């Protein structure tokens, strides 16, 4: 049984009493109706009449309810408004832009949205307008991506374990299903939960109206290495949990979610004529003259890294000074939260190499010490593991069932004083870190899958470990190190495929190296803007391989802007 995929085309019929959504390419599919002003959902098998406005959209982002408290009438009188009359808006994607293909699946970027009110407001509420403005700004500025046929929220390795007969939204990783909360009304209605009226039971026809959206960075580029055609892909998925901005969100919450958690997946796709970015980067040889790797099998090689704040209770309190006040609660109080966090990380990724890049001196030393203390506390305590949530991708257990080691023995703490090692613009010394991680990188491996002619993926190898990198912000130092690990793994993958010979490196191909550096620097900027409001620091090193004084001056400007 084939899965129900989201509609690629939706028409909206708007009237004073409802919004009706239908797909012109699927005339036999039921129409989704959202009644106004109640917000009740229903499916209609017939044609609705009376719509005053008909428009075409790319998809439904979700339904959001903003609470109204005190409002102002037309005469200026202040008046209380009950929750029953709270404003709700249907958020729709009015414009999207194709930005590349992966294995034949078109990927889109959200360009513009519209907030369609369920209630015509007679009162003006300044708080409501403020919340609405904030939300519109977030959606407008945030890079969001989606596909009608490809799951962007899951790594290739997790996709290989998914049930392809499930609707796209049910396969999505809950952490990276960015619009999951605003889709709650649609999902509840689909699952048969009442929507303001007696439930009619599960409504599988709603599946086609639920479109998972990912927030983060996406780059797909057709390129080559030493004349061998490939598609280079870099995806960073930002977690929807604890997704606040820099000084407003640090550390972990009670559920074990950490600030600025991102999963970055670097992919190489070989022998896939259906994959193509909108731009190619083939160097002097040109795209048309590149030679395919021997064999016709479409191969996917993937390598996943993560980043996230140190999982204890800590904060930086704004005191109007450039350096805010650092506060860290007792480590014992964070044990439950940290264990929840690492339980999930171990289940999902296997061995965790906890790469800590904060300074060993000064104010950052307290964060370093806290991380080391919480890790030691977990490894020395009796294990009380938290049960996996089968509704999320925690069902993907990387650890073998017969592994007899202690649960938290899968955590491997690695410290590298990044600033001290690279001071004086000696950034080449960051390569010393590879010596500390090499054994773990080799043992953890990467994902390698080959498409079967009958469909599905023949998994040749799995990635069984992840490097979880952090600095204070999990931005600038983290970006430099992650790109370095990505390059090292890419070289290993291409050697294993026979594209490179032992002793050669991907960076020996200058055209590809230029592409690689710029894609990773773009990734750094996207992650940084989402968390700090500015582009990343130290990207001159990522883009060129050298730390420059001009880059240092640009970093100073960005630091002032962040403050």
Briefly describe each language-model feature range:
Residues 1-460, 489-563:
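Phosphoinositide system proteins, centered on phosphoinositide phosphatases
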Residues 465-484:
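A phosphate-binding catalytic loop at a beta-strand-loop-alpha-helix junction
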């Amino acid at each position: 049984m084939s899965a129900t995929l989201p509609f690629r085309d939706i028409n909206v019929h708007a009237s004073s009493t409802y919004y009706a959504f239908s797909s012109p390419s699927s005339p036999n599919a039921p129409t989704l109706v959202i009644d106004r002003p109640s917000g009740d959902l229903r499916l209609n098998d017939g044609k609705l009449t009376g719509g005053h406005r008909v428009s075409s959209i790319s998809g439904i982002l979700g339904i959001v309810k903003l609470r109204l408290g005190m409002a102002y009438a037309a005469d200026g009188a202040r008046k209380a408004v009950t929750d029953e009359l709270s404003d709700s808006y249907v958020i729709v994607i009015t414009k999207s832009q194709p930005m590349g293909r992966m294995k034949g699946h078109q990927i889109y970027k959200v360009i513009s949205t519209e907030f369609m009110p369920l209630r015509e407001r007679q009162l003006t509420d300044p708080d409501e307008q403020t919340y609405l403005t904030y939300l519109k700004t977030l959606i407008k500025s945030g890079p969001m991506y989606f596909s009608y046929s490809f799951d962007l929220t899951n790594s290739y390795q997790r996709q290989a374990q998914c049930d392809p007969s499930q609707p796209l939204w049910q396969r999505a990783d809950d952490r990276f299903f960015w619009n999951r909360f605003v889709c709650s009304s649609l999902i509840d209605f689909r699952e048969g939960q009442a929507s303001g009226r007696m439930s009619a039971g599960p409504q599988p026809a709603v599946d086609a109206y639920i479109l998972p959206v990912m927030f983060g960075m996406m780059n797909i580029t057709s390129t080559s290495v030493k004349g061998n055609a490939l598609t280079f892909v870099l995806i960073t998925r930002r977690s929807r949990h604890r997704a606040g901005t820099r000084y407003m969100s640090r550390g972990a919450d009670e559920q074990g979610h950490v600030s600025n958690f991102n999963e970055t997946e670097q992919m190489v796709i070989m022998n896939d004529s259906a994959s193509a970015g909108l731009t190619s980067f083939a160097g002097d040889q040109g795209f048309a003259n590149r030679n395919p790797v021997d064999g016709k099998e479409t191969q996917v090689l993937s390598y996943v890294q993560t980043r996230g704040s140190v999982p204890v209770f800590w904060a930086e309190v704004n005191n109007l000074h450039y350096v805010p006040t650092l506060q860290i609660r007792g480590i014992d109080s964070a044990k439950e939260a940290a264990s929840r966090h690492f339980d999930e990380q171990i289940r999902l990724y296997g061995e965790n190499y906890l790469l800590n890049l904060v300074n060993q001196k000064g104010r950052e030393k307290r964060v370093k010490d806290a991380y080391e203390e919480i890790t030691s506390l977990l490894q020395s305590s009796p294990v009380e593991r938290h049960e996996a949530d089968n509704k999320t991708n925690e069902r993907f257990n990387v650890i073998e069932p017969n592994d007899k080691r202690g649960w938290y023995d899968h955590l491997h703490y690695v410290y590298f004083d990044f600033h001290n090692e690279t001071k004086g613009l000696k950034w080449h010394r960051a390569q010393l870190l590879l010596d500390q991680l090499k054994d773990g990188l080799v043992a953890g491996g990467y994902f390698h899958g080959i498409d079967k002619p009958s469909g599905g993926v023949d998994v040749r190898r799995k990635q069984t470990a992840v490097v979880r990198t952090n600095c204070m912000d999990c931005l600038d130092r983290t970006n430099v190190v992650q790109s370095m690990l990505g390059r090292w793994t890419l070289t290993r993958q291409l050697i294993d495929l026979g594209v490179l010979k032992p002793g050669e490196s991907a960076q020996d191909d200058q055209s590809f190296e230029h592409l690689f550096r710029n894609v990773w620097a773009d990734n750094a900027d996207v992650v940084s803007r989402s968390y700090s409001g500015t582009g990343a620091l130290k990207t001159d090193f990522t883009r060129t391989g050298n730390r420059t004084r001009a880059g240092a001056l640009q970093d100073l400007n960005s630091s002032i802007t962040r403050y």
